Amino acid sequence: ETYPGEAFFSQYYVDKSSAEAQQRQGKYLSSAYCKGAWVTPIAPDAETVAPDQATSTISADYGYYDPTGDSFLQGNVVIDQQGRQIRAERVTIDQTQTYAKAEGNVQLAQSGLISQSDDINYNLKTQQGDLYNSFYIAEQQHAHGRAEKIAKTSDNTLELENATYSTCPPDQKPTWKIQAEKIKLNQETGRGETKNTKLYVKDVPVLAVPYFNFPIDDRRTTGILTPIFGFT
């Protein structure tokens, strides 16, 4: 890889003229400065079922079920929850069929979001969990980055620790990126918040602030607008 996460990001970053991008019918495409666009496995406007009503369909190369203890799945594991999906090399599910630990190139996809992690701890009933050592893509926000930990606290909220965030094309040195101790992305409000933040331009730090609030979608807000970075 020429930059961290290249193998993962290249799966979902496509040319705007490609058949995959055209399936979005012009929705969620990045700015005119970018030739490419993110296309994730589950579209941002895909219908989902409420966590307490969703059923899980599970497949794997090998499975072992123990009604008195943990159950194990190994090899091409897929857990499909009607609009949400986990893929992993290995998954352990507890006796109550509530908590799952997934390991090995774990991909979690839902409504325009996809991540790849070393491992995750996931509640199958609430569909919340913690992801460790992750790369992530947010299609609707044209964004990507990496994080030591991602906490999925609700369908609409992600909390990232020691993370980066950029809306530039994936590259070794993106035109700009935010690096922060904590990043909170709230799709319901359309805002992102960061703590102990540095702004990098071409991998050079140009600004450091203790707190930063920025839009993650196209909704209009009052107050100071964050800058839009362009390049030629």
Name each region found by the language model.
Residues E1-T232:
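Structural signature for solvent-exposed beta-strand/loop edge elements and short helix-capping sites
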